Amino acid sequence: MGRTISVGAAQMGPIGRHDPRKVVLKRLMELMKEAKSFNCDIVAFPELTLTTFFPRWAIEDEGELDGYYETQMPGPETLPLFECAAELGIGFTLGYAELIVRPARNARTQLRPRAARRVYRGQGG
């Protein structure tokens, strides 16, 4: 017989265009703690979890645009999220924009409670 896992779907709420990454990460960690309090084994965050939905704006400044993308996962800014998950013993999955050289891809990372990490990439349109 298979084992049962409990998955929490995290509702992020809005992220403003200029919300600092630290504020967003704090919200994510609070949601992760809340999911753990409901005995969730995994918490699922939505796509573009770390930023506002930036494609809605015509952003011409390449530097500003690059700020919405991740160059590594985990990176220096996102490492506390991974550490929080390890401390809580909870897995998570989150979608994020990844800065890469063409072809464009969408990425989703998954951290399992035992720290096994997988990155899934989909071909961009």
Positions of PLM-derived features:
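Hydrophobic structural segments
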Residues: 1-125
